[in-house]
From Swiss-Prot:
Its EC number is 2.7.11.33, 2.7.4.28. This is Putative phosphoenolpyruvate synthase regulatory protein. It catalyses: [pyruvate, water dikinase] + ADP = [pyruvate, water dikinase]-phosphate + AMP + H(+); [pyruvate, water dikinase]-phosphate + phosphate + H(+) = [pyruvate, water dikinase] + diphosphate. Belongs to the pyruvate, phosphate/water dikinase regulatory protein family. PSRP subfamily. GO terms for molecular function: ADP binding; ATP binding; phosphotransferase activity, phosphate group as acceptor; protein serine/threonine kinase activity. Pfam families: Kinase-PPPase.
Amino acid sequence: MQMKRTAFFISDGTGITAETLGQSLLAQFENISFVKLTRPYIDTEEKARAMVQQINNAAESDGARPIIFDTIVNRDIRAVLAQSNGFMIDIFATFLSPLEQELSADSSYSVGKSHSIGHNSNYMDRIEAVNFALDNDDGARTHYYDKADLILVGVSRCGKTPTCLYMALQYGIRAANYPLTEEDMERLQLPNALKQYKHKLFGLTIDPDRLTAIRNERKPNSRYASFAQCEFEVREVESLFRRENIAYINSTHFSVEEISAKILVEKGVERRFK
């Protein structure tokens, strides 16, 4: 039986930093099932006391201490949380103290510093990249491809849209995507809209059985979702990628984070921010 533990990601800001680092660390423990709870904007002692009650309830229910990842700046609020029956990992204290020593400087200990608009010059790049991904989704527009950093190509429902949006949000990458249709495959060549941008193309493919399952959620029992159709499209699009010398990866067993990282490395595209 798989062990179960509760994990809290607690912050006086958005909770993004605590959640991102906490998720990465917990992923290393594959034999433990974690109930993950994000609690942003715990910015008063009253809210912290309410959190202590939640943590203690989880400890009693699980029969084990919850794991707490926090990025709380205020020492008084942290002191309240420390009274809980949880195992606390103070992310700022863990990393900032050694950095202060190395840099011979005091940190600002500012709430929400890494994700605030006022202190983040990348905010508009992020918004523009997301708008670009949405405007150029699914081959809807092709006349802005000259402004794209990347153009993802592949069969319908292989993961192009979420990958484009993730790269936009996380790295400010302007990524368009174009679905290759049965008609495109029958021509045995790239669509005209893509030919002059071949250097920007990256292919996504997927296992036919997985594609069938995804398409059946959208159009059950249709030819579009049949295994025979999915197998045909995947086979033909992979043949097209090889013929046109377009790099591609199979998205079946990778997360959107892994897919995005592999694409950027393969294409040598620099992230606008990190």
